[in-house]
A protein has these predicted regions:
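Conserved non-cysteine loop/helix-boundary elements of the Radical SAM core domain that shape
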Residues: 1-157
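Auxiliary Fe-S-binding modules of radical SAM enzymes
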Residues: 129, 139-198
Length: 198
């Protein structure tokens, strides 16, 4: 990830290269909670970023450990609260369903926890194993984990989004997706990621 100074230089270059006078949204994938710092958030605000995405993937620590994510559930909460406190009023959160070993109850727990944070939009990704992902490299280790109750999982996530006042605004599929499911974005009115629907 970029250091704050590098991020500042990059965003200066972006600002110098494009006309922002009619800009309606400036989104940055802030990414993993362990890579987000107060200094980086300050740089984003300085350059007029209006929407960020924080990507916990799951709120179950055992799953994060299993898939090789280096952040903790507590870091997710702290990072989200920090971004809110610093003034970000349009925060998306990304979750992945179909992660190894996750049951309906694990996904239900993640959805309950995200509702406590109350982001402005929510993206539910179905697991798609990338070529260099740990799940692909160590496929034998994860071969016994399967996704269950696909339709019920998507209904559970949709209900959580609805409880937060969100509606679906985009859907797409990708290669090697688990369980024949889709990726779905939910948002409150006026908080949809414009770049997702152009």
């Amino acid at each position: 990830t970029l250091e704050p100074e590098q991020l500042d230089r990059l965003l200066h270059a972006v600002r110098d290269s494009f006309d922002f006078s009619h800009n309606q949204e400036f989104t940055v994938e802030a990414g993993r909670p362990d890579s987000i710092t107060p200094e980086k958030l300050a740089v984003l605000l300085k350059h007029g970023v209006t929407r960020i995405s924080i990507n916990p993937q799951t709120m179950n620590q055992k799953t994060l450990d299993l898939i090789g994510r280096y952040h903790t559930v507590e870091q997710v909460k702290e990072t989200f609260q920090l971004a809110r406190k610093m003034g970000f009023d349009n925060i998306n959160m990304d979750f992945i369903v179909g992660l190894p070993g996750e049951t309906m109850e694990d996904i239900r727990f993640s959805m309950e926890e995200v509702q406590k944070l109350n982001p402005d939009s929510l993206t539910i990704h179905s697991l798609a194993i990338k070529r260099a992902a740990r799940l692909n490299i160590m496929r034998e280790q994860y071969k016994d984990f399967t996704i269950e109750n696909n339709e019920q999982i998507m209904e559970l996530c949709a209900a959580a989004a609805e409880n937060m006042g969100m509606t679906p605004y985009y859907m797409y599929r990708q290669k090697n997706i688990a369980g024949n499911m889709e990726n779905v974005g939910y948002a409150r009115t006026g908080r949809a990621g414009i770049y997702n629907i152009l």
